[in-house]
Amino acid sequence: MGFGKSSPFLAFSILVLCQAGSLQATPLRSALETLPDPGALSEKEGRLLLAALVKAYVQRKTNELEQEEEQEETEDSSLDSSRAKRCSNLSTCVLSAYWKDLNNYHRYSGMGFGPETPGKKRDIANSLEKDLSSHFGVPTDAN
């Protein structure tokens, strides 16, 4: 199963080793052993083989990248479909949007709201009474 992916690399490495062996400054064989090998590749054949291997490698990589992009697109569309299923009931989506807005308003409004601020409600009520009494001309206590 892993051999199918590594076969272009194996052929490429064999080609490189053959080329490196022929380019050595001091040959390892004697002059008598340098008879032409019928299985050896000519320079043109080696270049064609190398070009074919590179082309196959590039094609395989582009196919892998396309498959990854398709998988990402299907994952994105599945997220959108799950959100659409959740928001199929319009009141649920509207309620959650209003809930977020309400929480943001109370969080950033500066008014105390909720169980975290038990004393501020009285302070706000007292300040409102003082403001209303000043508008209507009612005298306030000097406390």
Swiss-Prot record:
The modification Proline amide is found at P118. Residues 118-133 have a biased composition (Basic and acidic residues). Its main location: secreted. One of its GO terms (biological process) is regulation of cytosolic calcium ion concentration. It comes from the Eukaryota. GO terms for molecular function: calcitonin receptor binding; hormone activity. Disulfide bonds join C87-C93. Keywords: Amidation, Cleavage on pair of basic residues, Disulfide bond, Hormone, Phosphoprotein, Secreted, Signal. It holds the Pfam family Calc_CGRP_IAPP. GO terms for cellular component: extracellular space. Residues 1-25 form the signal peptide. Residues 65-78 have a biased composition (Acidic residues). Residues 26-84, 122-143 form a propeptide. The keyword Signal applies. Residues 62-86, 112-143 are annotated as: Disordered. It is found in: Secreted. PANTHER family: CALCITONIN (PTHR10505:SF16), CALCITONIN-RELATED (PTHR10505). Calcitonin is a peptide hormone that causes a rapid but short-lived drop in the level of calcium and phosphate in blood by promoting the incorporation of those ions in the bones. Calcitonin function is mediated by the calcitonin receptor/CALCR and the CALCR-RAMP2 (AMYR2) receptor complex. This is Calcitonin. It comes from Ovis aries. The lineage of its organism: Eukaryota, Metazoa, Chordata, Craniata, Vertebrata. The gene is CALCA.
